[in-house]
Amino acid sequence: ADRAMELLKSLSTDSPWLLVFNTISSHIPFHNYPEAFAEKPDDAMVRYRNAVRYTDKQLGRFFEALSTRPDFENTVVFILGDHDTPVDSVDYLVPQPLGLSASQIFIGIFSADSALFNGLTVREDVASQLDLGPTIFDLAQVREPNHFWGYDLLTQERPAGQPSVFFSQNSYYLGFRDHVLVGGLENEDVYRAAAGGESPYTLTTETADLEWKKRAVGAAKAV
């Protein structure tokens, strides 16, 4: 939080600002918190909980610093991950299941301005990080056309029957579930391509598997 708080001090309180900060303290394999804060045993679940506690503490420090600014009530904070991970399965860097469900992972949106949420209702449809761009534009009262695939979660409804698209680089899977089209690649595919190898879409010789991957790309373009 020290670096984020330093950047916060440099921002004007009289004009709009955007601060994007990426932390790796809770990133797998959960070795990125200080040893002075907690031990780092072989048990990945213990490290995971330590990493989450450390991240939570640092977020608290950041919010305390933010709350002292005169523009605090005009500020909206989004907290999200840089990508998904199959938390309910064995990950490539943590050789043990973490015992978590993906349904326990949320994107947090915080604001001290209670009027911001007046009149809003709970929505049960699918939302994702693709929707954050349009939503932030709405909160900032930017009414210009934009290139985002997503929808403004505060004012727009997703067209009925239109599937959402979810891609994961981890553990390739693809299919329809609750009107959501999901797909991804094996880790080996991703790393091989990143190292200059073949494209992930040409690696498989199994016709059915290749066809499903093509459908995923086609669905993404359609949305």
Residues covered by each model-derived region:
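Solvent-exposed soluble domains appended to multi-pass membrane proteins
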Residues: 1-223
